[in-house]
Amino acid sequence: MTTTTCESNSIYPVRWQDNKVWLIDQTRLPMEYGEVEITSSEAMARAIETMIVRGAPAIGVAAAYGMVLGAQEITTDQKEQFLADLTRIADRLAQTRPTAVNLFWAIERMLKVARESGPEVAVITKNLLETAQNIQKEDVETCRAIGNHGLLALPEQPEKLTILTHCNTGSLATAGYGTALGVIRSAWTAGRLIQVYADETRPRLQGAKLTAWECLREGIPVTVITDSMAAHCMQQKLIDAVIVGADRIAANGDTANKIGTYSLAVVAKAHNLPFYVAAPLSTVDFSLKDGTGIPIEQRDRAEIYQVGTTTLCPRDVNFYNPAFDVTPAALITAIITEKGAVTPAELIFLQDS
């Protein structure tokens, strides 16, 4: 049996045990905590599409394990056919969420390992599992480094900060610890945080459901606000800084993140508040010179008009439901990575680091 070990007091949304994957079902939080057993690559693809697992780094890890499950499904012992079958599995996983670049990064890393392995299919599968586990372990280490660098990047005054964040960027969105919420955790541990303001993050409410849940688990004071209250809170001087995550960052620093992020950046600029993006370098797509080339996922209209079984508004109207928006680099104070905090203009220098 090969098991992914976890610290007992931490949240790990993806767990490998007994040749299968267990995912925390994030669609059931915060009312119910439970795991979903994933035994096939197709089941993993559906779990990513339906956001049982979500967050750019987390779906990268999940996709890597989905590749392992797919490798276990392949029956041929010929490497050439194995690679052809594995590529089809990779293509299916890549179709699940088009914006988050970590997904494609992890899939390509897995395919590279398969191509460069020897001719024995059993050895290739073993190498794929080891690679998926390494991706998971590396992401936890990366998030902790982001937290440390982010702590140093925060404004020196006031000594104790109130930080606004958007969506969920914590342990649930990564392999563990978190990106933007990882910085917040580090600030809390260092005694530099008074409280967190969490946007509810319409339409799927990841801030209200998931960020608030994670903060409560760790004893971090958290206040949930509707998305439309953020500007008012800044105007009333309730916010000292804004920290968000990212799903894809272009080479110039333009950042795609959960819908509503751009609005926050605009109002933060208007109120002279620092606006930080926290993300691993695997989220940076250096092949894109700016954010105009970032694909924006369009999701089901029902996410807007319905919560659970409750209909919120007339269905017989048009709905527009982009999952992400792009914040221009000019609105971003710094991008916090595992290599340090840099301005958007300096990001390109981290490409080969």
Swiss-Prot record:
Belongs to the eIF-2B alpha/beta/delta subunits family. MtnA subfamily. Pathway: Amino-acid biosynthesis; L-methionine biosynthesis via salvage pathway; L-methionine from S-methyl-5-thio-alpha-D-ribose 1-phosphate: step 1/6. The active site is at D247 (proton donor). This is Methylthioribose-1-phosphate isomerase. The gene is mtnA. Keywords: Amino-acid biosynthesis, Isomerase, Methionine biosynthesis. GO terms for molecular function: S-methyl-5-thioribose-1-phosphate isomerase activity. InterPro entries: IF-2B-related, IF-M1Pi, IF_2B-like_C, Initiation_fac_2B_a/b/d, M1Pi_N, NagB/RpiA_transferase-like. It catalyses: 5-(methylsulfanyl)-alpha-D-ribose 1-phosphate = 5-(methylsulfanyl)-D-ribulose 1-phosphate. Its EC number is 5.3.1.23.
